[in-house]
């Protein structure tokens, strides 16, 4: 019996895969050549003008004031163990989950879920408690470095982005449900809300909220005071703040343990519903955990927090927590603008669910609220999540418009540093790197959630 001869080898440059690799290598080489040439050219031109290059200027004294200052935790050596324990806890939980999934051909049960929660939260919390003295709280001042100024501005940007994403999602959901309402007045009001906000530039809306709304509030002496709990004037919104006492650590740990217990109960209830058709009890046991554990911590350590009320001293209020008009205008403007787009995305996702699903749920005597929460929205999420990623990214990028209304975000403070130091290339590079990281984090998180809610085919 004659042996079959092996097929002749195809040259690398003639196979599709080989040509693809060659093309990618050539393009990458050309890109690196252009980038290195541009970098050398920039260094030469900077040297001719007597401008130093590099990031050493970040340690220089800033010398300017930032209107929105946050307390920044400055980690020391021991905090590295916190990061190690966090990564180790997540890795252990992932290994346990993968092992049980392969062994049982299904998700883990409630007991192993509790163990994973305990490991993933317990290890970092224990490490943080052991090295609690290795964290120094610092606040920016005019004598601080450029690095601390950028850190403060970055926190301001992240704060606006997070609150804007949450607020625009909640507001968009409410408007979407209003657009689908059988009530003629509510439906048309929501429709005009969407049409108006989608077709007005976001910068114009920021100007409206800042100059027309928040700058027209009364002066400090004529503030709107609601029992000392809420004070509103031209300089901002003031509310009481919580001041942690000696028992705050145990109280917060008890609250976290109660939340983890509720998650375990929800997991157990879902498993019972899948196995028997009857969900387990969650409300009363969860309420008991949420009340009993923090109450015990309160009784053991005493009052965990005290209230610091804002008090008028001189020409402004001191104490409590204050929200500046710039911050309020930026958050409200971005939230209202993006909520119009989110409303249409959510509405299209709800309408993408087959009408038979709603009719079948009603045939089971489910209330309209249950139909929306249990049947419609879970199926609509796989349509809603992908386009919502773009809207969240838009909030992060549009937050750079804060410079127009005087809010000290990352771009605004970076521009001030650029004008003082003249390090344009370095500052622009920092801008690009930070916003790229923020976008990748948002995109990665939404892609992870999209994989969780996608339709699983058998």
Which residue stretches match the model-derived regions?
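Transmembrane alpha-helices and adjacent helix-loop boundaries
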Residues: 2-458
